[in-house]
Amino acid sequence: MSVPDPASAIEVKEKEKEDAEKFSFMAPVTKAPKKQIQFAEDMQEFSRFPTKTGRRSLSRSISQSSTDSYGSAASYTDSSDDEVSPREKPQTNSKGVSDFCVKNIKQAEFGRREIEIAEQDMLALISLRKRAQGEKPLTGAKIVGCTHITAQTAVLIETLCALGAQCRWSACNIYSTQNEVAAALAEAGVAVFAWKGESEDDFWWCIDRCVNMDAWQANMILDDGGDLTHWVYKTYPNVFKKIRGIVEESVTGVHRLYQLSKANKLCVPAMNVNDSVTKQKFDNLYCCRESILDGLKRTTDVMFGGKQVVVCGYGEVGKGCCAALKALGTVVYVTEIDPICALQACMDGFRVMKLNEVIRQVDVVITCTGNKNVVTREHLDRMKNSCIVCNMGHSNTEIDVASLRTPELTWERVRSQVDHVIWPDGKRVVLLAEGRLLNLSCSTVPTFVLSITATTQALALIELFNAPDGRYKQDVYLLPKKMDEYVASLHLPSFDAHLTELTDDQAKYLGLNKNGPFKPNYYRY
């Protein structure tokens, strides 16, 4: 038997040591307990903040806060303070003012940063502020508003204040308010009454607090959906004796105004912002084209490629939704009542079907019609398991959610703004935001596009407030074409765009003023 060489043994051991160091990343971890203890401490640190459903896990904390901070700062709203209604909590801002009701005034600093970020992409409103530093066209205006309360609308509200107006504000949607932004507005002195997750009773209470003031009488209304206008007509009709005009943003609210006008019950001029070119062709189309995907991804993590989706309605909102979904490889069906819109959908490459014909096979149902009961209980009963149902229209009437609140169906909240409605046989439908507006309830929207709409609203308020007697009668009006063009021109510098100027001869040939308007009122963009 041969005797091993000691020198060789040493070389072998050194070689094994080198290999162990070289490939140490492949070796099993043997000193994990210390790391695990440290990780457990980290989890305890994150779990110190309770939620309604118990302690929040580390991974869910990170996911929830990073996802929801854009919409409502979930890190704030998921606290034990949720158990106490803001109506029951006395709050004052740093100046001792208490004429507001928000979730938590302590969030104001964070909300101010959100507003400052939005201002960077809303340069048209900032330009309006600068141009009106000397002359304040809204001096004397007392504007009561009911819109979504987000960082973008906060820039609009503060612009109106900078132009001389006094404002009182509530939310037009119980889920779309950014609590930190509402707090920042309250800290700045705006009488704001809104928080995310209001009850129906809270919703009308907030509107009432904006209107029912003995020492403060509104003379302008800025509405989104018509709820504020409806409340004033129903509860305080005498307020309209001093109202100079109404500015309405949404198709739902505009429809209600035209109904009032047709019944000869509209007693003040109203400006239809929804059908202005700068709202229809930009906000309704481009905003929805980007935000529909954002809302669906944040709430459901859905994979779009290969999915079958039906979009109810092919107006500008429907067009934006369909374009976004088609680009990601979905099979898109469209339902329509209007043959012109239906033909547009066909020529854009979409199958136009009745909802009953595709309801069993689609994976996602999106409504954007502005109508009621577009998706009925019968449709919901026939949907496939795990079908996602959501709404991109303003009102929550498009999906018959009330029909789902019956004893035989079980509601299970699985995420913020995500409910599983479970049938007795185990089938479940995924309902987003309880049928309310998806993008502002569950995600966020592009700031630049909202700048266009907000600037249009500001100019409409200025026009109605300063219009001489007799210019506008008790009817619904579109924004003058010249103002639409002015709004567009304010946003062109962001793209370094340079307009071509007509020569005198060209202007004469076209029968136009060199400075616009450049299209007749009947022109379809």
What is each of the regions a protein language model found here?
Residues 1-97, 102, 525:
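Eukaryotic N-terminal low-complexity, Ser/Thr- and Lys/Arg-rich leader segments
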Residues 21-27, 39, 45-47, 53, ...:
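Rossmann-fold NAD(P)-binding glycine/threonine-rich loop
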Residues 66-71, 80-87, 92-99, 107-124, ...:
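Adenosine-phosphate binding glycine-rich loop
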Residues 78, 90-138, 169-307, 486:
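Glycine/serine-rich phosphate-binding loop and adjoining beta1-alpha1 elements at the start
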Residues 146-165, 280-283, 287-372:
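Glycine-rich phosphate/diphosphate-binding loop of Rossmann-like nucleotide-binding domains
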Residues 173, 337-338, 395:
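Residues in the short beta-alpha loop(s) of Rossmann-like NAD(P)-binding domains
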Residues 215, 219-226, 348-405, 409-410, ...:
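Rossmann-like NAD(P)-binding element
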